[in-house]
Amino acid sequence: MDAEAWLASEKRLIDNEEWTPPAEREKKAAASAITVEEYTKKWIAERDLAGGTKDLYSTHARKRIYPVLGDTPVAEMTPALVRAWWAGMGKQYPTARRHAYNVLRAVMNTAVEDKLVSENPCRIEQKAPAERDVEALTPEELDVVAGEVFEHYRVAVYILAWTSLRFGELIEIRRKDIMDDGETMKLRVRRGPARVGEKIVVGNTKTVRSKRPVTVPPHVAAMIRAHMADRTKMNKGPEALLVTTTRGQRLSKSAFTRSLKKGYAKIGRPDLRIHDLRAVGATLAAQAGATTKELMVRLGHTTPRMAMKYQMASAARDEEIARRMSELAGITP
């Protein structure tokens, strides 16, 4: 472009009130050319996330976003492109599909803030996944389940069910995290392991609220003390893990699941999962009188909805409520 043409172009921009410094225009042009893959990688790198979460986001992006949308300039993303991508993923893996969409939507929210696009093209209305209708275990059923679990780490069943710790939180509890004056025992949840690639990396807990002390019910505290006193189950020293394999290594979720499934089968509940023990704890705490706020603190949740989500229905509890309602009416069943 010669000087006269350049001046004419600049004058046009001024007349249309669109003029900005050339350097700024060049920077904006370069930014608008950044692709979805480049921007997503930058977005993940800049987020203050736990290592495991970053790895999970990267996996969803690598497997489901980059192959289709990776080469598309962020500035050219449209609702039509997103709808086509969403439909192309199919319905075989709904959870992975939903997570990939949530990553892309979060990335595009930041792109709006960065003024790369005027609005977020991710506008698909997702149906919330159906809540699992699971009946809570009774303490008696819990004893049967625990009785079928490998004795070396049987105490884990009771800890998960009565304290509502996440499995990842439990397997990082060390001797130094156990506060016990002989009467009251608290477990300080401060770290959590996560799989990053082929390695297990210990980092922050799932959320800031997840860092918390959890008071252990006295009967479970007694079990933990007995477990800690058994040198075949727990090593000495402040760094010793509370729950381990027979070789003293960190207990894996797969190994614990295999053992736990035997217990679930024993009571005719093969549908249950490890995480359901956390829900049992929330239900038992609520039945013991915990308020929603107290449940939020105990479970390490940031919203009442999440705390309520973990409470299960109990047929026996429903019968007890019905009896108490009659008592309020002055009638003794």
Swiss-Prot record:
Its EC number is 2.7.7.-, 3.1.-.-. Residues 132-323 form the Tyr recombinase domain. The active site is at R166, K206, H275, R278, H301, Y310. GO terms for biological process: DNA integration; DNA recombination; establishment of integrated proviral latency; symbiont entry into host cell; viral genome integration into host DNA. Pfam families: Phage_integrase (PF00589). InterPro entries: CB, DNA_brk_join_enz, Integrase-like_cat_sf, Integrase_catalytic, Integrase_recombinase_N, Tyrosine_recombinase_XerCD. Coiled coil: none annotated. One of its GO terms (molecular function) is transferase activity. Residues 34-112 form the Core-binding (CB) domain. Keywords: DNA integration, DNA recombination, DNA-binding, Hydrolase, Transferase, Viral genome integration, Virus entry into host cell. Integrase is necessary for integration of the phage into the host genome by site-specific recombination. Belongs to the 'phage' integrase family. This is Integrase. It comes from Mycobacterium phage FRAT1 (Mycobacteriophage FRAT1). The lineage of its organism: Viruses.
